[in-house]
Design a protein with these regions (language model features):
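Short, glycine/charged-enriched secondary-structure capping and boundary segments
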Residues: 18-21, 49-52, 94-98
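Cysteine-cluster motifs in flexible loop/terminal segments that predominantly coordinate metals
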Residues: 42-74
Length: 110
C-alpha cells in the first residue's frame, strides 16, 4: 500500500511539511509506503472548464505547473493525505486550484 501526502503550502519546510512528516512516520511504522508531493511556490492556474482534459487522456491542457505531475503521482497511490496551511478558515488557494484541476482532469486517479 502507498499513501501520497500532498503538501499544499508554498513553504517546503514549514509547519505543514512537519505535520505531514509526522503522519508519514506513523504510516511507515505500520508498513505503509509514503510519498510526499510538494506543490511548490510557483503559481498554479485555476481550472477554466475547457474540457480538453477529456481529449488528453486525463491530463490537463495547462502543462506549465505541477498538476499533471500530481495526477501521475496519484495514479500510483492507494490513499491520500492532504495538508495545507489555513488562511481565513480555508485551505490555501494553491491546494484548492491544484485539486480542482486534478479532480476534473484526472478524477480516475483519486
Amino acid at each position: 500500500m502507498k499513501v501520497l501526502l500532498v503538501n499544499g503550502s508554498s513553504k517546503a519546510n514549514g509547519n505543514t511539511a512537519r505535520a505531514l512528516a509526522e503522519v508519514a512516520e506513523q504510516l511507515n511504522v505500520e508498513g505503509i509506503d509514503t510519498e510526499v508531493f510538494q506543490l511548490g511556490a510557483k503559481p498554479i492556474r485555476d481550472c477554466i472548464g475547457c474540457g480538453l482534459c477529456g481529449k488528453l487522456g486525463g491530463r490537463c491542457t495547462f502543462d506549465d505547473d505541477v498538476v499533471n505531475e500530481l495526477i501521475a503521482a496519484a495514479e500510483q497511490a492507494d490513499g491520500f493525505v492532504f495538508g495545507s496551511p489555513v488562511y481565513y478558515a480555508h485551505p490555501s488557494g494553491r491546494i484548492l486550484s491544484a485539486l480542482d484541476r486534478a479532480f476534473y482532469a484526472g478524477g480516475h486517479a483519486f
